[in-house]
Amino acid sequence: MNFDIVQRRLSLADDVVDSDSPMQEQDELPMTQIPGDSSANVLISTQVQSKLDEMELKKVMKKNLTQFAFESLGATESAPPSRAATPPAKATKRKKSTKAAGRTSTGTGKKRKRTPSSIKSITQFNTENYESLADNRRSRHVVSLLSGKKKKIKDIIDRLQVEDASGSPGPSKSHFSTYSPHEWSHILQLLKSKFPKCPPGQVEAVYKYVYGGAEKDNVWYSSQMPPSDPETQASQEFHYNAQQPMVFSLSQAVEEEFVDAESPALISESFGREQMKGPSFLDEQCISDTTDETGVELKIDEDVARAFRTRMLQPYWLREDVKMKEQPGVSGDKLMKSSSGAARPKEQRWLHLSYNGVDDATKNFPKSPTSTPEPRSGPQVLQRHTYRTPSGLAGRDQLIDLTQCSFNAVKSLISPLKSEVQVPATRTTTWNDKNHSRPQNYGALHQKVQLRLCGGIADSEIYSTLRSRQVVWRLQDFDLQDSEEETKYQLLELDFETVDSKVDLSTAPHHRLSVIKSPTSIASPGDLCDFEVSVKRNASVPPSLPLSAKNLRESLRAIGLKPARTRSEMAEQMGCASQHLIGENAQEQRQGLFDQFTHLVEQSPSLLEKVYTFEPLVLSELIDFLVQKDPFIDKIDDSTIKQWADQMGICLRSAAED
């Protein structure tokens, strides 16, 4: 018996069984298998298949090429035998016309004409015709907005463009129509009704949009514009250079010597005469603008510098008509002389410098020997309603108040200062008007001040004290309500008297102040008013400023106190809280309460031991202990103590759990 034959038959039988049940073979497969080395066979089969694909592609390509009757050996040889026997069909040739044959024989073919008006470059066309295109676009947009008919505007402008290009009227369109008299009247009515009601700013904006005035300021549109004419630029540069700017040095601007303020005409004449003297005279007045030796020189005229400084020292709020109304029958020269007396300090006399003539302030400074003071009537000073505080007036040493903060001295000016030089703060005033006599005649502007009252401001923003003259509070009858705002506002009027005292705000209405306008702006330099507002921001409400019971109750709950029944009791609680608690708002005062509780618990070793061991504390016993240490805690709400215990990780329980 041949065992090899038997083994081969058994293996074939196993293969037959495996082919009958493929799912069983998958179930019997182990979890991990070692793949056989079949990479070489895969590579060989891939190469063979790629060669077969290339051969098939070549056959398809040759088969497609045989459809064309090319007179080439490659095409005929590669054609299949069935198609090689049949001759290819001849293509029909189109006969040339007699005109084309004549042009070909003579050699003069039809050429394309180039017109100079054709667009060679779209970029060049847009650059050259930018302004006309922009005007066309703006006018089309404006008229379409006024009429509301964009299609009609487009048809009209397109027809006009065709007529301008060809010189003959273009073809008429069926849907084309011009404006009727009724439509033109409608546009005219829109213009008459809209433009008178528009502010000048909107009218100017429309004008600039239509005529292209605003595009020069835009970087993109200005870059698209063609370059301007060189002759125009030369004329503009000459006109600009003809006017020499006024340049002043720091010493000339702040010098103490100056003469009468000359009129602009005389200043220009003197400046012109000095220019005619030649370069030698101008070189004497040259002052370098930089510290390095660059040779740059600036021509400065002393008379112009003095006149400029005089104009700088004039206050914006100086109004001569107000003083003329207060003193009828008194001329301007007499009023100026009477207002500038010897008792007035130097800084105050500086405020009266103007073009109206010689002022007494010039007597305090040495005049130039060449100056001849002559009273002249200069231009009228413009009336400006811009008010400034005394600290912002020119000529006063009040630019930096040392009572408020310190400051570091700069070293960029040529002065050799060290970088660490610091001017310390002080409690004494640094103003130069200590001997200033305060007049008692206050104008009507300082008698009444209107305050805007806001009902939605927080309690911490209440002004508690006001130090000034005697104040009388008056609440206006009407409400100032804006349609866009939800909060309500009211006007409160204050009348001041000349008696200096601490004001009691008990007569103030039941509102909270949001804005206090200090009447430091004065109508004349003589009517200086020292209106001081002492503001104390505290969450507690002072008893001098009564509020409603609802606001007091909300304030007490925000701090963590028990709200009382009556309003007077709640006011007492707020006063007591302001004495015990420190903080600017309710959150800070509430945190101060928590810190006080923690400090009291840390003083008791037995209570602190229970806290460290997480032993529950009876709430009533904890409250009794805290009240025994500080009686003020009796007014604290129990929920506040529970919140503090929860924040500190202290376990609490009630007495009923025992």
UniProtKB/Swiss-Prot annotation:
Residues 365-374 have a biased composition (Polar residues). It holds the Pfam family Slx4. It comes from the Eukaryota. Transmembrane segments: none annotated. GO terms for molecular function: 5'-flap endonuclease activity. GO terms for biological process: DNA recombination; DNA repair; DNA replication. It is found in: Nucleus. Keywords: DNA damage, DNA recombination, DNA repair, Nucleus, Phosphoprotein. Residues 75-90, 99-108 have a biased composition (Low complexity). InterPro entries: Slx4_ascomycetes, Structure-sp_endonuc_su_Slx4. Its main location: nucleus. One of its GO terms (cellular component) is Slx1-Slx4 complex. Phosphorylated in response to DNA damage. Belongs to the SLX4 family. Forms a heterodimer with SLX1. Regulatory subunit of the SLX1-SLX4 structure-specific endonuclease that resolves DNA secondary structures generated during DNA repair and recombination. Has endonuclease activity towards branched DNA substrates, introducing single-strand cuts in duplex DNA close to junctions with ss-DNA. This is Structure-specific endonuclease subunit SLX4. It comes from Lachancea thermotolerans (strain ATCC 56472 / CBS 6340 / NRRL Y-8284).
